[in-house]
Amino acid sequence: MNYQNEQNAYQMQNQENVPPMSYGYPMPTPEQFQKMSYGQNFQAPWDMQQQIQMFQQYHQNFQGGYSDPFTYQNQYAHQPKIVTVTLQDPQDLWKELHYLSNEQNVLNNGRKIFPALNYKVEHLNPESNYKVEILLRRMVPYQIQYSNGSWSRKNVQSKKTIAMKTEKVFVGEFTGQDIMRTGLDLSDVKVFNIGSDNKKKVTPYEEMSDAEKREYDTQYSKKKTSMLEVSNECKYIPVLIINEILPNQELRLVGEFENEITQFATVSSYKNHIVKALRTAANPTSRGDAKQEAVQVGKQWRSSNKSLLESLRPSMICTSVSTTAPSTNFHAPLQYPGTSSPSSNFAPMTPSTSFDSAYSSFNVTSSTPEQMCYNPIPSMSTDYSFCSFDSATSSPPLQPTATSPEASQNQIKLEMNQYM
């Protein structure tokens, strides 16, 4: 590496938009890569070996373009960031109702979720198509009851089995550009139920006549495709599901997102009169004296609780509850040239985690089913650098050999200094 290249590397190393290279060392030259990967007495950390593999692949397959791997590495700093979903609540209605323990009135013929669910989505691929769905997840595995101004666990066991998740309801297919420009408006999403333990007895399906069964099946199937089936006296939270539609029409999960302030209890009639007033006052379909009265009740309540409401600062950013991605990471694991696909069992790593603490967190000679790996390109997911491999399905492409983590760690530092 000549002096000019060293200067270029140093400048790139210190650009704000380029994170530190692996373990804080500058990116090696192709010649140093060659020594690292094939030298008899040197074993680089295997995350560095992933970089070696990536850049060897680059030099073998990339025709023309960048003159050195530093420019190639820098391109990753400009990749889309982690997908974020933010709940839109311009009137603070979700915040206020969450403080009061929100309630959602449910009828057999369906009711729209209110307040409306509106989301802002950032960092999608503008040229990709996305499939958007929604479901409701139960917050607790038991029914609840309202008593003495608060909700508590219901002592009576339900006679029917209540699913912990509803079926998904299709919202639509959109381009990433449209979603990011206009957001996602889910104001038409409805919830329904098919009776309650506290209501008049419903004829069991087994006791219906054939004609009644056909009618029931027809109506039920229509509801299930357009509405979310819930049970009364349960606490639910909406979960937004975004899948990228790949060129082969397969789906890649981007994330399943929820915000805690959108949870609600399903009821056949409102229990808290303040909740009812706030919802009635804000609902554009409400009319007449009932709405005027609700507006006055809402004003009085907000006035008497002004300082409290101003102190409430709930996060509008949705968290990911995806089963194929960690709650703090919204992307599938990055795959590098020539590597196996890692599994989705992540453990988060903070940007402040040092090399010593990171490296000592796993045993490089371990033969256990799961091996920890460090993301060789931190700019792709700076906050979430650890992932694990499941040896039953895949394995790390390269691994260091050492007698102990401590010895390997010291040897790596010494030998990297030698080559750098």
Curated annotation (Swiss-Prot):
Span list, region Disordered: 395-420
- Pfam families tied to this protein: T-box (PF00907)
- What GO MF terms are annotated? DNA-binding transcription factor activity, RNA polymerase II-specific; RNA polymerase II cis-regulatory region sequence-specific DNA binding
Q: Where is the composition biased (Polar residues)?
A: 395-412
Query: What Gene Ontology cellular-component terms does the record carry?
Result: chromatin; nucleus
In which compartments does the protein localize? Answer: Nucleus
PROSITE patterns given in the database record: TBOX_1, TBOX_3
Xref: InterPro entries: p53-like_TF_DNA-bd_sf, T-box_DNA-bd, T-box_sf, TF_T-box, TF_T-box_CS
Sorted keywords for this record are: DNA-binding, Nucleus, Transcription, Transcription regulation
What are its GO biological-process terms?
Answer: cell fate specification; positive regulation of DNA-templated transcription; regulation of transcription by RNA polymerase II
Record feature DNA-binding region, as residue ranges: 93-291
Entries under PANTHER family matching the protein? T-BOX PROTEIN 33-RELATED, T-BOX PROTEIN-RELATED
Name recorded for this polypeptide: Putative T-box protein 33
